[in-house]
């Protein structure tokens, strides 16, 4: 086994160990219901601006794609990516980042928790996006 293959295997084992149940304590949404959150995302029209995994027709290109959100360091580019911040962001984005393009959709607390739970859910399975792995470990394909 090459050095690159050994490093990749160790990294994959380490990452797999960090994803107990697919949700970290940072992204666990207390009281959130992911399936209801998917439905609420449709009801609030999130797919008009965002690509949302598991939501047919959610192919908007105004805001960022929302897949693999749990693996990102920030929400809205500057806010720490944790459950309380994401819930507040969904409820009142203008309060957290005045002037943002994200509109205030008058999302209530329960709906915001459920939407956050859905966005943090592991939709694709696996170990996350390959762009998080060092390119030198992936080869030069």
Label the model's feature ranges.
Residues 1-8:
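Bacterial N-terminal signal peptides that target proteins for export
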Residues 15-17:
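C-terminal motif of bacterial Sec signal peptides marking the signal peptidase cleavage site
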Residues 19-42, 131-141:
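Electrostatic cytochrome c docking/interface patches
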Residues 28-34, 38-40, 51-88:
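Gly/Gly-Pro-rich "capping" loops immediately C-terminal to redox-active cysteine motifs
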Residues 37, 43-53, 86, 102, ...:
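The canonical Cys-X-X-Cys-His
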């Amino acid at each position: 086994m090459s050095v690159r293959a050994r490093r990749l295997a160790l990294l994959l084992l380490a990452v797999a160990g960090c994803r107990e149940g697919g949700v970290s304590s940072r992204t666990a949404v207390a009281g959130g219901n992911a399936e209801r959150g998917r439905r609420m995302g449709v009801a609030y029209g999130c797919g008009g601006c965002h690509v949302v995994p598991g939501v047919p027709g959610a192919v908007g290109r105004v805001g960022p794609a929302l897949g693999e959100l749990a693996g990102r360091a920030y929400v809205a580019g500057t806010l720490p990516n944790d459950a309380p911040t994401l819930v507040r962001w969904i409820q009142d984005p203008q309060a957290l980042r005045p002037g943002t393009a994200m509109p205030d959709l008058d999302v209530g607390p329960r709906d915001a928790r459920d939407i956050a739970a859905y966005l943090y859910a592991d939709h694709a399975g696996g170990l996350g996006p390959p762009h998080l792995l060092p390119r030198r470990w992936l080869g030069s394909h």
